[in-house]
Amino acid sequence: MLEKAKIDRINELSKKKKAGTLTADEKVEQEKLRKEYIKSFRTHMKGTIENTTIIDPKGNDVTPHKIKQMRKNKK
């Protein structure tokens, strides 16, 4: 995930934006940090989904076909 300092900076810039005191340079920085955060989040979420197996109460693997295909393509 993203470094704590960067997340703190995103939150700080968000508060400044709400207060109406965000400068143009800070707005550019905020957008860059948000994009970096979203990219990191999506990468980690994709990894979590790819490594999830769904088992029904009868013990059958009912993992969606799309996830199985993602695993197969990864190998």
From Swiss-Prot:
Location in the cell: Cytoplasm
Record's GO cellular component terms: cytoplasm
UniProt-listed InterPro entries: DUF896
Presence of keyword Cytoplasm: yes
Start-end of Basic residues biased regions: 65-75
Keyword Membrane among record annotations: no
Disordered: annotated span: 55-75
Coiled-coil intervals, chain numbering: none
Primary localisation category: cytoplasm
Keywords from the UniProt entry: Cytoplasm
Family: Belongs to the UPF0291 family.
PANTHER family: UPF0291 PROTEIN CBO2609/CLC_2481, UPF0291 PROTEIN YNZC
Protein name: UPF0291 protein lin1342
